[in-house]
Amino acid sequence: MNQLFLHCRPGFEKECAAEITELAAAQGIYGYSKTKDNAAFVVFITQDERGAETLIRQLPFQSLIFVRQWFAGFGNLSDLPVTDRVSPLLEAARALPKTSDLTGETVDTNEGKALSALVKKFLLPFGKALDAHKCLDRKSPWRLHLVFLSGTEAYLGVAPVNNSSAWPMGIPRLRLPKSAPSRATLKLEEAWHHFIPAADWDRRLAPGMRAVDLGAAPGGWTWQLVQRSIYVEAIDNGPMDKDLLDSGLVTHVLADGFLFEPKKPVDWLVCDIVDKPARVSSMVIKWFSKGHCRQAIFNLKLPMKQRYMEVQKCRTRILGELGSLGMRAELDFKQLYHDREEVTGYLRVF
């Protein structure tokens, strides 16, 4: 397998391509990317005939920023006969490793979403054909991915179950709670799902912890913390949701988020302030260097150009400055589904 299919946010194809090219080279694997603006996917073609398979095994999916989901294969299948798409796709599947499951996908564009009904309808007969030809093995570490780009073109490939997103297309199925003050609440929930293993939630998001939410109004992120019974200082000059204030867990502080500092250390810092990445990075460094918190989730609003480079610059600076203070830190970034022109960072120190 020499081709990697990479789902990404529409408009971030160049960042996705730059990232996979750099990370692949670090693994000694070289190739080139095929991109199209706003297509919501990138295809990375390796020089080595097994380069994509090696990459998807060795490169930690968790380390990828702009890639929502990925799988390795041999390339696209075009001119699929409308009357029998199963036969050519079955032939392609038989050249791949046996898989434990089948996932049907589109790309995250309006054109892609229009194919959702086709994908859903096709999965049943295709799944039966795979089963009949012994292409499925419930114990296999691989998952089979099928992406339709049109009614006659598709990509087919495999991804390691333990080194890929658990969600089709890398898009979590989260529902907006009726009582949440804003849609931004889903961003923090998705961040927790991505950065913190489910088995660690009770320990790292424990009831009774204390958090500071910078730029909190009207309270989307604070709402998530309150649902975990975490005490929150909500810092914002704007108004907060009344029900949150009545919960007994929230203290609203009228202040500038960049100037506020807690009187005592807290467990969590969360920040969704719209500002330059360098300024947000400085604030995060200040909080950790002064011992104000041990964990943080924050957003970096990206510039129009050199967005991947900007994230890498912020990463290098944060880790470098904390490292110079003798602090051992873990820092990950991800462009979440609920992010827009931004990435979300998770930082903790040990």
Curated annotation (Swiss-Prot):
Q: Name one GO biological process term.
A: rRNA processing
User: How is the quaternary structure described?
Assistant: Monomer.
Q: Which Pfam families match?
A: FtsJ (PF01728), RlmM_FDX (PF18125), RLMM_N (PF21239)
Q: Which organism is it from?
A: Cellvibrio japonicus (strain Ueda107)
Give the protein's function. Answer: Catalyzes the 2'-O-methylation at nucleotide C2498 in 23S rRNA.
Q: Tell whether Oxidoreductase is among the UniProt keywords.
A: no
> Is-annotated flag, keyword Protease?
no
Q: What is its EC number?
A: 2.1.1.186
A GO MF label: S-adenosylmethionine-dependent methyltransferase activity
Give the top-rank taxon of the lineage listed in the UniProt record for this protein: Bacteria
Q: Kindly list the positions annotated as binding S-adenosyl-L-methionine.
A: A217, P218, G219, G220, D236, D256, D272
Question: What is this protein's name?
Answer: Ribosomal RNA large subunit methyltransferase M
Family under the similarity heading = Belongs to the class I-like SAM-binding methyltransferase superfamily. RNA methyltransferase RlmE family. RlmM subfamily.
In terms of PANTHER family, this protein maps to:
RIBOSOMAL RNA LARGE SUBUNIT METHYLTRANSFERASE M, RIBOSOMAL RNA METHYLTRANSFERASE FTSJ DOMAIN-CONTAINING PROTEIN
- Catalysis: reaction(s): cytidine(2498) in 23S rRNA + S-adenosyl-L-methionine = 2'-O-methylcytidine(2498) in 23S rRNA + S-adenosyl-L-homocysteine + H(+)
Q: Which UniProt keywords apply?
A: Cytoplasm, Methyltransferase, rRNA processing, S-adenosyl-L-methionine, Transferase
Question: Which GO CC annotations does the UniProt entry carry?
Answer: cytoplasm
Q: Which residues form the active site?
A: K301
Q: What is the lineage of its organism?
A: Bacteria, Pseudomonadati, Pseudomonadota, Gammaproteobacteria, Cellvibrionales
Q: Where does it live in the cell?
A: Cytoplasm
